[in-house]
Amino acid sequence: MATNAKPVYQRILLKLSGEALQGAEGFGIDASVLDRMAQEVKELVELGIQVGVVIGGGNLFRGAGLAQAGMNRVVGDHMGMLATVMNGLAMRDALHRAYVNARLMSAIPLNGVCDNYSWAEAISLLRHNRVVIFAAGTGNPFFTTDSAACLRGIEIEADVVLKATKVDGVYSADPVKNPDATLYEQLTYQDVLERELKVMDLAAFTLARDHNLPIRVFNMNKPGALRRVVMGENEGTLITKEVAAVTK
């Protein structure tokens, strides 16, 4: 597909997994990966795109194992929320070092560390081309950061949620386990539900579906993939309400 002269999106919600930040380290934050992502976000800002970001916390804390060992789920989820704030602080710092204006907002009050989440303030910042990082998930336990990404995407009236992953999009099966798995170019919400494809958890996905929020799944590890997505190229998998499923 020919590259469009202008971006096809005006405002996006970028969902990054915490694992994406750890690079090859296996834990924590890889500074080189963080800086590369900041540069890619900077490219979008320079294209005039308004960018909201939600980051997971799996690189710093995984509550599932501790929950199995007896930890209260609410406590574990609160710890996970704090992990997303730590990632948000790192991303804000990386963006500032790249000379990008960025604001970090938390769904739980952390005075002196970052701003409290405010819908009106977030909209104002986005309109002034500031990157807004939304941390601490939804502020409630039992909800994933994918749910937070869809919720914030709906609230800020984003054109699309861009879900960055470690694979090239949505496949018919796990491409790591099955090399013959098919990569889908386009799917409908119904396709995903009927085929039980793993895009995100059901609560997050149905939230996006009910509010007709498109989702684009792509590989953030591919250099330039994010830019190609916003310029309308065939990168990753697009999930919408009415587009007929097409496979590569």
Curated annotation (Swiss-Prot):
EC number: 2.7.4.22
InterPro entries according to UniProt: AceGlu_kinase-like_sf, Asp/Glu/Uridylate_kinase, Uridylate_kinase, Uridylate_kinase_bac
Recorded metabolic or biological pathway in which this protein acts: Pyrimidine metabolism; CTP biosynthesis via de novo pathway; UDP from UMP (UMPK route): step 1/1
Main location: cytoplasm
Known catalytic reactions: UMP + ATP = UDP + ADP
GO biological process, one term: 'de novo' CTP biosynthetic process
Positions that bind UMP: 57, 77, 138-145
Regulation of this protein's activity per its record: Allosterically activated by GTP. Inhibited by UTP.
Gene Ontology terms, MF aspect: ATP binding; UMP kinase activity
Region Involved in allosteric activation by GTP, residue ranges: 23-28
Positions with a binding annotation for ATP: 15-18, 58, 62, 165, 171, 174
Record localization: Cytoplasm
UniProt-listed SUPFAM superfamilies: Carbamate kinase-like
Family per record: Belongs to the UMP kinase family.
NCBIfam families: pyrH_bact (TIGR02075)
Subunit structure: Homohexamer.
HAMAP family hit by this protein: PyrH_B
Name listed for the protein in its UniProt record: Uridylate kinase
Upper taxonomic lineage: Bacteria, Pseudomonadati, Pseudomonadota, Gammaproteobacteria, Enterobacterales
